[in-house]
Amino acid sequence: MTPVRSAPSGRTGTYHVPVLLSEIETMLANATTVLDCTLGGGGHTAAFLERGVRVTGVDRDPRALAAARERLGEYERSGQFRAVLANYAALEEAGFSTDDRFDGILLDLGVSSHQFDDASRGFTFREGAPLDMRMGTDADLDAGELLNTIDEVDLSALLRAYADEPRAARMAREIVRRRERRPFATADDLVDAIRAVLGPRSGAPDFARIFQAVRIAVNDELSGLERALPALRDRLTPGGVLAIISYHSGEDRLVKNAFRDWSASCVCPPRQFVCTCRGRPLGDTITRKPVSATEQEIDQNTRARSARLRAWRSA
């Protein structure tokens, strides 16, 4: 969901052009109806709307949704665009019918540039920024509350799984030790704990990795994605395309494995002894390898460096 640069006027106004926009447009070129599950600033959706595509945009962030509706108000008034406040992992709770089908479905995971640039949202390690990191009002705890209450063993597992941190146990122990003296309240508190473990030479890449891990836990991102994948697959029309941009190895692994399983000749559960799917794959994987941002795009915005795009087509 990470944008790259300001767009020329007439394309998307003063907003940023989303990562891998041309690749997404190519993969969903035949779509006449699109579900944008991570509306954010509305960059992808704006491009689809300009082509005459009907778009339903979903976001769990009320502020992001309000801004997108203001930006795309003309399309909403005409009926071409519909905005829905919802978590893409729980569309039924937002009133989506099981009969709602789309030619294209897009997920641009991670934090939007608008969320990232707003220091009050607490997604960055800016000095004095609050430890919040909630993408929407549906998160149970903010980052500070999580760090102040989570069990040391669970925190160690979180840092190991989501940040690939080899010193996860030591870092968890340091966080627990510090919170006993004073609760974590700002980004500085977490940065100081990271430095205490990784040393004075630790810097922005280390902070970003740990902050990302905490954010993933706060918003239940990997579990939500895992639950959503089969449900979104079933919302595709025949020949419809599911395109997903990820920024974390755990996200990409979930997407890759799901697409592989859905493209197999037999999709019955492993423990089912008799095949009932008749040996027909559910569809085919469009991207054998993930598509990355070009060097030019990365030069314009380093946030695009970790973007990985995979796409799958329904039979």
From Swiss-Prot:
Q: Where is the protein localized?
A: Cytoplasm
Give the E.C. number(s): 2.1.1.199
> What does the record give as the reaction this protein catalyses?
cytidine(1402) in 16S rRNA + S-adenosyl-L-methionine = N(4)-methylcytidine(1402) in 16S rRNA + S-adenosyl-L-homocysteine + H(+)
| Top enzyme category | transferase
What GO molecular-function term can you cite, just one?
rRNA (cytosine-N4-)-methyltransferase activity
One protein family per Pfam: Methyltransf_5
Binding positions for S-adenosyl-L-methionine per the UniProt entry: G42, G43, H44, D59, F96, D108, Q115
One GO biological process from the UniProt record? rRNA base methylation
Per UniProt, which keywords does this protein have? Cytoplasm, Methyltransferase, rRNA processing, S-adenosyl-L-methionine, Transferase
- One GO CC annotation: cytoplasm
Q: Which domain of life is it from?
A: Bacteria
Where is this chain primarily localised?
cytoplasm
The record ties this protein, via CDD domains, to: AdoMet_MTases (cd02440)
Tell me which NCBIfam families the record gives. 16S rRNA (cytosine(1402)-N(4))-methyltransferase RsmH
Which protein family is named in the record?
A: Belongs to the methyltransferase superfamily. RsmH family.
Return the PANTHER family for the record: 12S RRNA N4-METHYLCYTIDINE METHYLTRANSFERASE, S-ADENOSYL-METHYLTRANSFERASE MRAW
Q: What does this protein do?
A: Specifically methylates the N4 position of cytidine in position 1402 (C1402) of 16S rRNA.
Q: Which HAMAP family match?
A: 16SrRNA_methyltr_H (MF_01007)
Question: What is this protein identified as?
Answer: Ribosomal RNA small subunit methyltransferase H
State the organism named in the record. Answer: Gemmatimonas aurantiaca (strain DSM 14586 / JCM 11422 / NBRC 100505 / T-27)
Q: Which gene encodes it?
A: rsmH
